[in-house]
């Protein structure tokens, strides 16, 4: 028997507002805490958790950026000649995404979404590596680099497998007692919430299913480990989208030409602009100031949010929609969805949640701080599971260093 297994399970989009009044894990993980998220989408939330750093440090923020010099998509421009009614269909985009990802040997999450093929040669994609693997960050290391440097045996989800397949793989590792740390990532709730919203009756059964899975994993771990230190957490919440704004139409009505005067990425909750000619910024800024459903996020606020990039790589101007407002159509999709995240991290539905059977130190306030929990627990698991002759087997004081 081993002494301790730190089990970290990320339930994507299980935000504080969605979960706080539900019975989810109240018996198994009674200590619950509301956590600040980071500004951006899962493309930055997940790397922030895995690295313990903020977007302006690890440089994993939004997926698509203006960078024609390094764009790998030039060969896809011929697709612009196909009917948009065909190329905008999700099933077509998914098939193309799978093919392109394989050809380009991208290891991280990749999706062509609704990027127009007419302009696709202007963009680069920023997650070519997987943050769920060692050496998978754009800058710096992550928890898996840390574990491998210390030769700590661990399990991590394979994003190319289903939740059930990953659960079965982890269960096998637990029964064998081979690992000293586990990180599981379940994304299914996120997809459900996008479809049905944050108050739909389907949420309860999904959380009940997750709780049963977690109970089963803890039971299986009990055959090989004296103690399971359980941490279940999310990266962000989810807001219902009851208002839609055609921001593309607003900007395209200006006397400017896309690709010559400016370039933009219209994400689902924000628009990011690059300016190619003098005076264009002022024209676009003036028009955006009249859009009452959102606002320009200035450099001072971006610095406060730790999402400011001095080189403008992720955009020279960021326009953020109010919570609950969706850009439709956007480069993420042609049609509306019921709910979305990626709003201001202090908006009510943006907060993440942490559930655990351990005491949570006051220093754990935001999702990057989960990294400190992971390194501390993994370090102690190795000390307890593989003691040297000079070590005592008892657990040391369960304190955490301030982040």
List each language-model region with its residue ranges.
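Active-site-proximal N-terminal segment of extracellular/periplasmic enzymes that hydrolyze or transfer
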Residues: 1-41
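Residue-level preference for the first positions of well-ordered beta-strands
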Residues: 5-7, 179-183, 229
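Metal-dependent active-site segment of extracytoplasmic phospho-/sulfohydrolases and closely related
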Residues: 7-11, 16, 209-250
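Short, solvent-exposed turn/loop segments enriched in Gly/Ser/Thr/Pro and often Arg
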Residues: 32-53, 160-161
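His/Asp/Glu-rich, glycine-adjacent segments
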Residues: 53-197, 206-209, 289-293, 371-385, ...
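Acidic/histidine-rich catalytic neighborhood
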Residues: 227, 238-275
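Active-site neighborhoods of enzymes that stabilize oxyanions during catalysis
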Residues: 262-381, 403
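Short, basic, low-complexity termini and linkers enriched in Ser/Thr/Gly/Pro
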Residues: 383-403
